[in-house]
Amino acid sequence: MKTVILAGGFGIRISEESRFKPKPMIEIGGQPILWHIMKGYSHFGFNEFIICAGYKQEIIKSWFADYFLRNSDITFDFTKGYKNTIIHDQHCEPWKVRVCA
């Protein structure tokens, strides 16, 4: 089942934290609030997400795009070009995520 998460607010009440990143990306325990929300839904079998991002959406998109780079061991083989990058021991989540503007 798809779960829609509204993540486009400005975070005005926590402006000292949200000045540089959107509210869903403020970290708690080393992970963004958005990750904690998704983990909660995932616990109950909801693993397909549509994230409606607005304010600073590029930060949310970058976080998901770089997820494996942050959470896995990586070998960069510069002798054969960028396409020969190997991600070892991938830390996977059972999620399918779509980030919309």
Q: How would you name each of these model-derived features?
A:
Residues 16-17:
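Short acidic/histidine- and often glycine-rich active-site loop of Leloir-type glycosyltransferases
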Residues 2-5, 13, 31-101:
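Conserved N-terminal catalytic core of the sugar/cofactor nucleotidyltransferase
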Residues 20-35:
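Short catalytic helix/loop segments, enriched in acidic residues and glycine
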Residues 9:
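Active-site glycine-centered loops adjacent to acidic/histidine catalytic or metal-binding residues
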